[in-house]
Amino acid sequence: MPRSFDRFSLRGPLALALCLLGLALSASPGAAADPRGVSPASPNPLEGLRFFVDQESPAWQQWEAYRRSGQTAKANLIWKIAREPRALWLGAFTRPHFAVKVRRLIDAARAQGAVPIFTVLRAEATGCGPGYTGGSPAEDARTREWYEHLARVIGDDRVVIAFEPDSLGTLDCQIPSRRDDRLRLLAQGVNALSRLPNATIYLEAGASDWEAPARTAKQLRIIGISKVRGFMLNVTHYDWTAANIRHGLDISRRVGGKPFVINTSQNGRGPVSYRSNHRRINIWCNPGLRGLGPPPTTQTSHPRVDAYLWLNRPGYAQGCQGRPIAWYPPRALGYARLATTWESPPRGSRFGHFKRYPLSAFGIPR
């Protein structure tokens, strides 16, 4: 796989073929016999897949812009993001022409001989506070139809779906009378998508620095974990991979041994935290001085972990602190500069790369 943009300066078919060959997550190009992989005892359905790299993404376009303008150092940094397969986010924001856009991504993946990963974010689960309803019955109906529409658009195509990040962890953000509605809505979405014959699905399960495993496991059973491959962790958080493995194994034993995947797109330096009432509180909203984590792979540290995947979008700012959800090149460059393959803090380094957090670690997008 190229580590410098200079080695990818030839844009012909041979260069593209070599690049895509290097993106295979396994030496074998074959897919599992059962793409759904519902039984925990079935082979890892991600093993041997080549995942889609979107050459229309902001990261890829940024790399090309730096390359064209001769900014070699920045191009080499952004290439660390652009070259990796990352999830494609779908939601109410995927408009207009939702079906056309989804089919275009699926067709582009097929042209690469690859499989797209979709992070589905359609449920109203981004707010929090007194009186927050998380939508309405009418909005729930629109979301149910959206799930069904997505299922029709995907059809028989091979895909991986990361279903509704944060939707369980933020359940208590809703007013009590709406919480069961959220669970019913998620269950209906799981039911619609789990019927897809060639979709490997992982459900939202928070992160190791969030809800207790017993509570998350109960919610997973309610929304239909038995119908899909497993669950996902750390999609919007930054906690260490090793911590998420421990947390995930605790959840897994409570849901019949279901496998899981971990988002490692932004946890190469771990979380930024502070102490409050003798508890460690991790900052999830655009912490500074974070780094890319282990690249996507099915070669993980535990057999119950199907893969480390980049389910989030490094270089984007999350929609908080008054900032829109958007691509910020300085933030992307920062992630790339501080990239590591660490799964836990190295010995002698309390917070990854420094003993104390500098003030900038608590800042907004950098």
Model-derived features: positions:
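Short glycine-enriched loops at secondary-structure junctions
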Residues: 120-123, 162-167
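C-terminal region of N-terminal signal peptides and the immediate post-cleavage residues
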Residues: 23-41
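Surface-exposed substrate-engagement region within the catalytic domains
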Residues: 53-78, 208-337
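Structural preference for beta-strand elements that scaffold enzyme active sites
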Residues: 115-117, 158-162, 198-202, 228-232, ...
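Bacterial N-terminal signal peptides
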Residues: 13-26
